[in-house]
Design a protein with these regions (language model features):
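Ubiquitin system architectures
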Residues: 2-83
Length: 83
């Protein structure tokens, strides 16, 4: 399985994480996994009411939830925001 290392910012809890993402998973599934992981890492402090979106930090553009990581511009070192 191919993976990329990204830097994830979560502004609501003012935290950042370095996370490996599998390139064959859809962005929608990645968001679900990231939400669960951040919730656990923040000891339950991060609990979004609705499904968050994933954005590219540099371009501020949201990612299409229907494509895979491989089909997006997410590469090693990409900085993402989970809002």
């Amino acid at each position: 399985m191919s993976r990329v290392l990204v830097k994830l910012y979560v502004p609501i809890i003012e935290e950042k994480y370095y996370i490996w993402l599998p390139t064959n998973k859809k962005i929608y599934n990645i968001i679900i996994s990231l939400t669960k992981a951040v919730n656990e890492l923040s000891m339950g402090y991060y609990t979004p009411i609705k499904s968050p979106m994933l954005y590219n930090k540099l371009s501020s553009t949201p990612y299409d939830v229907n494509i895979t990581v491989k089909e997006s511009d997410i590469r090693n070192g990409t900085e993402l925001i989970l809002i």
